Amino acid sequence: ILKMFAGESFLVDYNSTPMFALSALKKNKIKYKHISCPISSLKVIKNSIEQKNFKEVHKFDGLAFIKFWSWFEQLDKNNMFDEEYHAKKLFEYRSVNKLFKSNSFPTISAFGKNGSVIHYRYSKGKSKKIKSNNLYLIDSGGQYLNGTTDVTRVLIHGQPTNDMKTKYLSLIHISEPTRRLV
């Protein structure tokens, strides 16, 4: 099919064009020029209703997360729950809001070393028990009628070690320049 376009020239956005498509264009000696897709930049611009909903949904979700965090901090160190229970507890706090429909993606609820596994998912009925003095990662989001959230936090029940503090601060320093780009 591409041979039909020999001698033609195409505009492609390197940020959204799959490598397979670019390779096919090169292989068939079809000329192309890079442009930034104008649609992508227009999606970033939000109207007043979208801006209002964005603020509102993050207030709802933030309140649910604060309640979850407060619950987490008040747990007795001898009576902690597992990763699955914690994910369900956050869902419970979000569910109080009548605009909440579901999680926006499966919650990553990871304790200790599990927090370093990319897109970790606890096994139903086999999730790790949360204990004091270790890091707990929760990456979750809510799907509300007026918007979607995505929140990642690292919590600890008890005291972090000096090593944890050093590594965590190093990560923040590394990611800070990237955050400013957004």
Regions found by a protein language model. Give the residues of each.
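Conserved beta-strand/loop block within the catalytic cores
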Residues: I108, N114-V117
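Internal maturation/activation junctions in enzymes
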Residues: S104-P106
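Acidic/histidine-enriched ion/cofactor-binding microenvironments in catalytic or ligand-binding pockets
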Residues: S116-N146
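Buried hydrophobic positions in well-ordered alpha/beta secondary-structure cores of metabolic enzymes
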Residues: F54, S109, N133-I138, L171
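Single conserved hydrophobic/aromatic residue that forms the stacking wall/gate
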Residues: H173-V182
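Flexible, acidic/His-enriched mid-domain "rim/lid" segments that flank
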Residues: I1-F100, G112-N114, L155-L169, R179
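A glycine- and small-aliphatic-rich helix-loop capping segment at beta-alpha/alpha-beta transitions
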Residues: S123-K129, R153-P160
